[in-house]
Amino acid sequence: MPRTNPKTSNFDIDLDWAAVYEQEVVDMFEHNGSIEVKAERDQWLRTGNIAVELYRIYKEDNRKAYTGITISDAYWWNISLVKNNETKRVVIIKTKELLGLVKKFNREKKYKIRAMGDKDSKFTTYGMLIPLWEIMEFENIK
């Protein structure tokens, strides 16, 4: 991953401070940071929501299996917002913070856990639809 070269950069104000966060992004993709990547297809543009998968129920035996964010070991959660098969925006949030928002919204009954996904599969996936603005809402940032 290319790094900013302090000798050729004209952005020298707060360069040392910014270098810490540049390294954080490098670590996220190259080193000790783990990142789960999810892509939201076109529908996010119409609804303004992202889907956060939580679990699935198998139709043959009604067994519940936790999936998605509930079992992820990733430190970061990447949400690629795709339109016409092209990534238009990327939102990156700490996995534990996004899971915390899901739990908070469920406790407050603000957004419901609902069935989502392919109806013809052997299981039904459940998750929460969260408006994108909620992720960026200042009061939700811990």
Give each language-model segment a name.
Residues R3, K7-D16, K64, S80-K142:
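Non-catalytic C-terminal interaction segments of nucleic acid-processing enzymes
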Residues E24, K38, Y55, D120-K122, ...:
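Intrinsically disordered, low-complexity regions of eukaryotic proteins
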Residues L45, T70-S72, N85-E86, N106:
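A generic structural signal for short, non-catalytic loop/turn and secondary-structure boundary residues
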